[in-house]
């Protein structure tokens, strides 16, 4: 009441914080989704963590400051590059069978989503031409997409690799530790 919010905790005490009238806050924009699907929190966390390191900080090339999300029949790909590093990860079985779509989601928006995901969440992701939304049981984040064409990364990834090596992970990790000292 009167623009204040009362917060209480178990045995901690009560706190009154200044707040605003909820009616004064703008409505979240509608996302006229071309693609809607759900994915487990652990899967989207894994995908973002495997690609976000390659996102560029160079504001002169805005398309590289986000992660390319490609939705295809039954799979979602995330791709990031800064011009020197490239990361691509594919998650199959997202339960989507519509038209393919490519969008570039800002890194800041994905960081917010990752920070607020609970382990048991299964966010619904809705992708449109200019916006994306990430909705869980308790929250909804809507972001503008980065406008532009992502570089054709497929040409730098070899189709076939004639060389192949099999080794135990423990042996590789041991060798890396010895070299890094």
Whereabouts are the PLM-identified features?
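Structural preference for solvent-exposed beta-strand-turn elements
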Residues: 1-181
């Amino acid at each position: 009441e009167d623009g204040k919010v009362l917060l209480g905790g178990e045995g901690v005490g009560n706190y009154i914080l200044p707040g605003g009238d909820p009616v004064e806050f703008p409505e979240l924009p509608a996302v006229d989704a071309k693609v809607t699907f759900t994915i487990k929190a652990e899967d989207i966390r894994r995908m973002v963590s495997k690609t976000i390191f390659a996102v560029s900080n160079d504001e002169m090339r805005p398309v590289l400051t986000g992660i390319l999300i490609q939705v295809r029949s039954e799979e979602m790909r995330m791709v990031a590059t800064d011009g020197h590093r490239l990361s691509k990860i594919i998650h199959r079985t997202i339960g989507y069978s519509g038209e393919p779509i490519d969008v570039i989601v800002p890194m800041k928006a994905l960081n917010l989503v990752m920070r607020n995901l609970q382990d048991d969440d299964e966010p619904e992701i809705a992708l449109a031409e200019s916006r994306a939304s990430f909705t869980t049981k308790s929250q909804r984040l809507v972001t503008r997409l980065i406008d532009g064409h992502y570089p054709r990364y497929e040409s730098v990834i070899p189709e076939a690799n004639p060389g192949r090596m099999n080794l135990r992970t423990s042996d590789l990790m041991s060798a890396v530790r010895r070299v890094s000292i």
